[in-house]
Amino acid sequence: MKVTKKDMIYEGKGKKMWSVAEDENLLIAEFKDDLTAFNGIKKSSEKGKGALNNKISTQLFHLLEKNGIKTDLVETINDTEQVVKKVKIFPLEVIARNIATGSLTKRLGIKDGTVLPFTLVEFCYKDDDLGDPILNDDHALLLGAVKDKNELENLRQTAIKINKILKEFFATKNLKLVDFKIELGKDKDGNILLADEISPDSCRFWDAKTNEKLDKDRFRQSIGNVKVAYEEVLRRILS
């Protein structure tokens, strides 16, 4: 697919988004090597990380599409770039949790590593200045993040379905899918699509036998060998 970058319309922590000269309904997503944690307080860079996330996310989006999940991915065009559909992103981080760790254990006092009895779905308001606060359903409606309760429930059920597909897939790769956060959006026809990425930047993966962390927690917690961990996740996905 031949496309031409036009203007950079957005730069986030992990990606740059570019308009496409040939089609106003498409964008180019460029994966960066930057590493950030704690809402951008901790920063670094890992050469090759962007390319790894691009490859991992491409594989997982294809897997989800085969299982009935609509995504924004059109085509991966090189090591660090994808062509994606332009979508209007809901101002929500949608989080699905299978095992308690991270902020959940701090907020609720649940022991780290506790397997949850059901998929816990949480919504956070995307606002760095506010620290991405967690919302209940009424908060989401009050802020206009969704149009009604049915739309919010649609987001919740989409996250649950994505979790089921990924959790079962990673179990065959000797990986525990601990939790993940996703972004969902609407295309020009009003369809809800999975957007952004699914990668070790946005998921927690633990080795099924040792519970070794193979995700961005290696950066958050200064464990090291971030790129090696991401490479291992990709190797298992492709195996």
UniProtKB/Swiss-Prot annotation:
In terms of InterPro entries, this protein maps to: SAICAR_synt/ADE2_N (IPR028923), SAICAR_synt_PurC (IPR033934), SAICAR_synth (IPR001636), SAICAR_synthetase (IPR050089), SAICAR_synthetase_CS (IPR018236)
Q: Where is the signal peptide?
A: none
Name the family.
Belongs to the SAICAR synthetase family.
Give the top-rank taxon of the lineage listed in the UniProt record for this protein: Bacteria
- What does the entry give for GO biological process? 'de novo' IMP biosynthetic process; cobalamin biosynthetic process
Entry GO MF terms = ATP binding; phosphoribosylaminoimidazolesuccinocarboxamide synthase activity
- Give me the reactions it catalyses: 5-amino-1-(5-phospho-D-ribosyl)imidazole-4-carboxylate + L-aspartate + ATP = (2S)-2-[5-amino-1-(5-phospho-beta-D-ribosyl)imidazole-4-carboxamido]succinate + ADP + phosphate + 2 H(+)
Pathway per the UniProt entry: Purine metabolism; IMP biosynthesis via de novo pathway; 5-amino-1-(5-phospho-D-ribosyl)imidazole-4-carboxamide from 5-amino-1-(5-phospho-D-ribosyl)imidazole-4-carboxylate: step 1/2
List its EC numbers: 6.3.2.6
Q: What is this protein called?
A: Phosphoribosylaminoimidazole-succinocarboxamide synthase
Q: Which Pfam families does this one have?
A: SAICAR_synt
Asked if the keyword ATP-binding belongs to this entry, the reply reads yes
Keywords, sorted A to Z: ATP-binding, Ligase, Nucleotide-binding, Purine biosynthesis
